[in-house]
Amino acid sequence: MNATSSATHTINPLGTDGFEFVEYTAPDAKGIAALKSLFVSLGFAEVAKHKHKQCWLYRQGDINFVVNAEPHSQAEQFASLHGPSVCGMAFRVSDAGKAQQYAIAKGAKPFVGKIGPMELNIPAIYGIGESTLSFVDRYGDKGSIYDVDFVFYPDWQARMAEVDAGLMEIDHLTHNAHRGNMDVWSNFYERIGNFREIRYFDIEGKLTGLHSRAMTAPCGKIRIPINESADDKSQIEEYLRQYKGEGIQHIAMASSDIYHTIRTLRSRGTGFMPTPDTYYEKVNSRVEGHQEDLAALKELRILIDGSPTKDGILLQIFTDTVIGPVFFEIIQRKGNEGFGEGNFKALFESIELDQIRRGVLDGGEDEKGARKEGASDA
């Protein structure tokens, strides 16, 4: 990035300052109960309930998850189409009203929700897959939207301490888009918020492939990789079929001690995507001088990437799909600001193994040959 483009990227028209919350829903009481149970197992405590709506706030560190079961709402409509899903997210911004107005002026579609008596009007637009993208300017020293709209339980802090697993903040979240729409959504974020591409990935596993553009806001605190499939069989296409459309694929949460976090989550029954044993045979040569405990990495199936002498390292691991096709990532950054590019192929192939076990891929040489032939025709 040259000096001019760097200066341009510092222009922050939305006044972004990170993620405020991620919102989840499900089509029935059983699904809502499953979400609540999942979040507790991940270290989130139910700390408050909405004053007038069937919405609950779950919190860990600086991460806020909202569970929305309100009848006749956008969340209910979203769940009726997608099943258990991520129906919205919110950005922290300097002025929520101005942020919404700017986004609409740049072509975003306004969202108008049902506002009850004495409730905050939280400005929002439609995002990927008709999920909501809200703008929140009440945070930090300016108070909180939850103080107005929610009632906190008397023991909410004790609840948090009891289940905490060491997750601190949302590091990034990803979008899965239909083929041809990766550029549509990257352009959307560039247009409404001056997001810029910081990484481009072209990933090919043994049988399938994907493309991804990682976009970041001018504040540097909101990072959104946007994925599209390179073929008909990849996990991106499977997600789109199962989810019945585009949407948020996974939410990455940061830990300062990933070993402690993963041991805690595994003890609570959290399942993680498999990593081949052969991956750990190459760690010392691929990430020379990493100084991590290789036995612990292998025991917990944690992935490592980066270069200690250049840009630092990161540690990461991915849960099984737990909300329909949606999953979570746990990440610890030790100087590295990437997304685990060196791990993508190993991760991609581990997901393919899971797809083969479930019958989505047949794993045969004919499949591989067909994919290569199709790629050459593109």
Predicted segments, located by residue:
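Short, acidic, Ser/Thr-enriched surface-loop or helix-capping motifs
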Residues: G127, T309, T321-V322
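Extracellular low-complexity, Gly/Ser/Thr-rich intrinsically disordered linkers
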Residues: G324-E341
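An N-terminus-focused feature that recognizes amino-terminal "leader" regions
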Residues: M1-P154, H172, R179, Q316
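Beta-propeller domains
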Residues: H175-R223
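A cross-kingdom feature marking solvent-exposed beta-strand/loop segments within repeated
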Residues: K49-R59, N64-V93, G97-I122, Q157-A165, ...
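N-terminal beta-strand motif that seeds the catalytic metal site of vicinal oxygen chelate
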Residues: M1-G31, V86-M89, I145-S186, K244-M253, ...
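Short, structured motif recognition centered on aromatic/hydrophobic residues
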Residues: G18-T25, F39, F44, Y58, ...
